[in-house]
Amino acid sequence: MMDANEIIQFISDSKKSTPVKVYVKGELDKLSASNTIKTFVDSKSGTIFGEWKDIQAYLEENKSLIEDYIIENDRRNSAIPMLDLKNINARIEPGAIIRDQVEIGDGAVIMMGASINIGSVIGEGTMIDMNAVLGGRATVGKNCHIGAGSVLAGVIEPPSAKPVIVEDDVVIGANVVILEGITVGKGSIVAAGSIVTKDVAPNTLVGGTPAKVLKEIDEQTKSKTEIKQELRKLDN
């Protein structure tokens, strides 16, 4: 896990990027060569990729040959790339936004719309449900469930601030907010819609706004919040 100062240095040192994709048509077999952009074109149409400042100059340089173009752009001076997901041993569904320098354990599940910021850690077998947010440095242990729409607050600055820590075997209901610096103890359950402003002891059920202790976890409660390993099964 990166500490706050390492994350700050990573962002500061990173090359800021404004990548674009451009669909072009025209006399493309006559386009000038370029070492700074990638072109995938035939004689009449194609696609080019590169940094906006390079693409902008290239379009101007070749404007007499380009009949029309459409530009796609989704970021400006971005400091943190997306995590390369190809070799992550987890189930990651379309639409999840996961920044670089995130750690994802084996068999984890990241659902559609989840947002995972730099420095976050997700343990083995943990599910991050739809539209949940893990802020910078938020740490979730093994075999947890973070409910849909829940927010684990991030702390990158000030660098001395403590991140959110969710220990192993915790179940967080939907639309829960866990504030900066909070630790949720092993085996605990946080009821849906709660706002957690204080540390949660292990094996405790809490709920409300702000969250308060409702009871210690018993076998009946455990059975209602069972983590199903079948949902974490991978083919490989």
From Swiss-Prot:
| Pathway(s) of this molecule | Amino-acid biosynthesis; L-lysine biosynthesis via DAP pathway; LL-2,6-diaminopimelate from (S)-tetrahydrodipicolinate (acetylase route): step 1/3
The lineage's top-level taxon is Bacteria
GO biological process terms, semicolon-separated: diaminopimelate biosynthetic process; lysine biosynthetic process via diaminopimelate
SUPFAM superfamilies found in the cross-reference section? Trimeric LpxA-like enzymes
The reaction(s) this protein catalyses: (S)-2,3,4,5-tetrahydrodipicolinate + acetyl-CoA + H2O = L-2-acetamido-6-oxoheptanedioate + CoA
* Pfam families xrefs: DapH_N, Hexapep, Hexapep_2
Where is the secretion signal located? none
One MF annotation (Gene Ontology) recorded for this entry: tetrahydrodipicolinate N-acetyltransferase activity
The record ties this protein, via InterPro entries, to:
DapH, DapH_N, Hexapep, Hexapep_transf_CS, Trans_hexapeptide_repeat, Trimer_LpxA-like_sf
EC number(s) in its UniProt entry?
2.3.1.89
Per UniProt, the enzyme's principal EC class comes to transferase
Q: What keywords are annotated for this sequence in UniProt?
A: Acyltransferase, Amino-acid biosynthesis, Diaminopimelate biosynthesis, Lysine biosynthesis, Repeat, Transferase
- Family classification: Belongs to the transferase hexapeptide repeat family. DapH subfamily.
HAMAP family from the xrefs?
Answer: DapH
Which function does this protein serve?
Answer: Catalyzes the transfer of an acetyl group from acetyl-CoA to tetrahydrodipicolinate.
Name of the protein: 2,3,4,5-tetrahydropyridine-2,6-dicarboxylate N-acetyltransferase
Question: What organism, scientifically named, is this protein from?
Answer: Oceanobacillus iheyensis (strain DSM 14371 / CIP 107618 / JCM 11309 / KCTC 3954 / HTE831)
What is this protein's gene name?
Answer: dapH
